[in-house]
Each structure stands twice: as structure tokens, then as C-alpha cells.
């Protein structure tokens, strides 16, 4: 008898001496953290690096609560307000290079984000086009196998084409809206520059008048007023001249409000009626006050302020003759030239000396007429013979 059999009989339970079990498979390593998306704005310090903006200035901007995302979403006017607040609250001397450097950094970051977004969009659109082409190929293959095309496939393709056409039209409308917004902002900035030039040199105040008064291909402006006597109320849809002069008084009140708000916020306050005043008037609901209309009749208001009796007599005469407001407007130049002759043909000094006219720019046409009158007066004086005694 085998001794192993005897041991097995004595010990029925016995360890299995087979091959060892395989070692447990170690768990897979955790995936690496996802890289930060490339289309997320960088930190403010990284954004302005290399553009000449001091770190102390960046710290002050951060203390005001501005981040890179906030600055990228701000307009040019809001950036100006932020810089004015930085100079007003912290008394911080913001260098000129820092102002331009910050704007350049924001433009570069916007361009980077737009390029990344366009690349990502192009990749998605490319994959979509590939999928669509594969679907079309498979449908053509099925159609070739079946010998024709079903009505369901035709209807599905028509619906898909309509959806794509709607998406394309929506994208075009969005581009047009963005382009119009940029054009309006550029035009607004150009008008502000024209106002600055008017404050420096006093010229160019009748650019709208010259463009509307004739010449070129501009449409003749329709006069919204009729000639009325003092105290007369106009009928129909047009207004009288008393209402016109009242608009200039309203502009003066709007200028005072803009000046008080500018002083309250520590901004530069305008000394004359500029685009800022017209924008404020539109903002508070006085949309009937606009720059072309007020600049067009400013010399008529000047005659009303300087010599009210002559202005009233002129109104009565033109009302009796049935003249329109355009002829009355042209007739208002001659009395003003006579008034300037008493002050050496210096019409700017005449405007500056009157409290209600000092806030208005002298019309270019009126200044030219005064200059011509001064030249003709000097030529006539030179042609006179010298006195005999």
C-alpha cells in the first residue's frame, strides 16, 4: 500500500498543490490633469507683459477689481473711464505709454482668442463636412443599389438645406450688426476729434451745414421750422422760431448738467456744447435735440441774443413776404456782420463776451463773412486819398 494513500485516508482534507494564482493587476495610473484650454484669457500680468505697463500699475488695476476677462470685454470708452478712476482714486500717474500699451495688449489678446476660436470652429466644421459627405456617399450607394431615391430622403435633404441656409443668414446678420457697431463707434470717435479741433482752433463747426446746404451729391435738408412772429404759435406739423430758440436754452441747461456730473466724477468737463452734450440729451429723452439742427441755426440764435429787436423785425418782414425759413436763415448773417464791425470784425470776441453765446462755436460761414468784410473795409480805407491838412 502506498504510504501516500494511507496519509490521504487519515487526512481527507488536503491542500491543492497546483500552480500559484497570478498576481493582481495593478490599477491604471490616474489620467493627467487636462491642460488649461487655450481659449481662456491669461492672467493680467501675463497679458500686459512686454507692453511697457508697470507691475505697480497692474496691481492698482487689480485692486480696483478688474481682471483680464473684464478688460477684454470693455469698450474704449469704458477703458478711458477705468483709467480716469485709476488716476482719480489712487492719484496714480498713468504714463502715456502705459495707456497705449494696455490697449495694444488687449487688442493682441482679442486677436489671439479670435484666432484660436476660429481654428477650433474650423476643425469642427471640417469634421461635420466630412461626416456629411460620408452620409451623402452612403445614401448614394444605397440609392444606386435600390435604383432610385425615396421621398423621405428627398424631404430630409431639403430640411437640412433649409437649416443650413438659416444658419448662414443668421451668421451674415451677426456680421453686419458687428460691422455697423464698429462703424458707429469709429464715427463717434471722429466726431469727438472734430469737437476737440473746434475747441483748439474754433473751425469746422459748420461741417454739417456745408454738407447739407448744397454742392456735391448731398440731399437738401428739409427745414423743420416755419417763420413766425414773436409769440406766434406755429400750425400744422412744423414748429415756430420761438420753439427753435427754446431748444438752445435747453442745450445750455444740458451742458450745465454734464459739467456738474463731470466734476463729480473727476472727469474733464466740456466748456462748449459738444457731442457729449448731444449724447446726454438723447440719453435723457430729448432726441429732438441733435447736432446738425443746432449748428445749422446757431447764428440765428446769436442775432436773437445780441439784438432782439433787429431779430424780431427781420422775422416780421419775412413772415409778411411769405418767405421760408431758409431765406430767413440766410438773412440773419448780415446783421451779425454789422455787429462785428463795431468790435473790429472780431466775431469770436463777440460770442465769447455774451454769456449765452460763449458755449457755442462760431459758425465757419459767419467767420468767413466777417473776414471778407474786414478785408473790403481795409481796401476801401486804403483807396481813400490822404487828408489835405
Swiss-Prot record:
Record field: compositional bias (Pro residues): 19-39
Keywords: Activator, Developmental protein, DNA-binding, Nucleus, Transcription, Transcription regulation
BP term (GO), one: regulation of DNA-templated transcription
Disordered: annotated span: 1-41, 141-226
Single annotated GO MF: DNA binding
Biased composition, class Acidic residues, residue ranges: 190-201
Role, per record: Probable transcription factor.
Name of the molecule in the record: Probable transcription factor FL
Gene name of this polypeptide: OSL
